């Protein structure tokens, strides 16, 4: 599996080396640059040329890092408990998987694009460093590790 650019995306040798190193090492690759320089298109072209699925997570100013992992809906669980719903017996019914969870859980290799990360809170990238480095995270509500 090697990326060398595509007919629609001309990349530099340095960029090809960086992309291929990330693929070989199975590590994240952070691409920085000015708007409109092709960062998003790079991820799409890598996934397309290598036949990999792409999982896109578009960041907004209000996005929190936790949302990429999962979200726990405690309010719905409380409401359902008051209504006597049996669904509350499985806390997993109230966990919504995020894009990072989907990428980690994927049976096939995939490209995870975390796009417009600069729009998020300044601590956003730091909040995901450990999870992306180890390629795993802990779900407190279910006491499980997602890899």
List PLM regions with ranges:
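Short gly/ser/thr-rich secondary-structure transition/capping motifs
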Residues: 10-11, 91-96, 136-140
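Conserved helical "switch/dimer-interface" subregion of ABC/ABC-like ATPase nucleotide-binding domains
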Residues: 18, 127, 131, 140-142
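Conserved Walker
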Residues: 117, 134-147
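Conserved AAA+/SF3 P-loop NTPase catalytic/coupling segment centered on the Walker-B
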Residues: 98-133
């Amino acid at each position: 599996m090697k990326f060398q650019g595509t007919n629609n995306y001309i990349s530099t040798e340095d960029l090809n080396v960086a992309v291929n190193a990330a693929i070989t090492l199975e590590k994240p690759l952070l691409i920085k640059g000015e708007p409109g320089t092709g960062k998003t298109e790079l991820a799409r072209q890598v996934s397309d040329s290598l036949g990999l699925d792409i999982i896109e997570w578009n960041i907004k100013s209000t996005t929190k890092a936790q949302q990429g992992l999962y979200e726990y809906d405690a309010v719905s669980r409380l409401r359902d408990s008051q209504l006597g719903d049996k669904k509350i017996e499985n806390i997993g019914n109230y966990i919504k998987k995020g894009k990072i969870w989907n990428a980690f859980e994927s049976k096939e290799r995939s490209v995870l694009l975390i796009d417009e990360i600069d729009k998020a809170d300044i601590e956003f990238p730091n909040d995901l460093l450990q999870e992306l480095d180890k390629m795993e995270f802990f779900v407190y509500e279910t006491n499980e590790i997602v890899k």
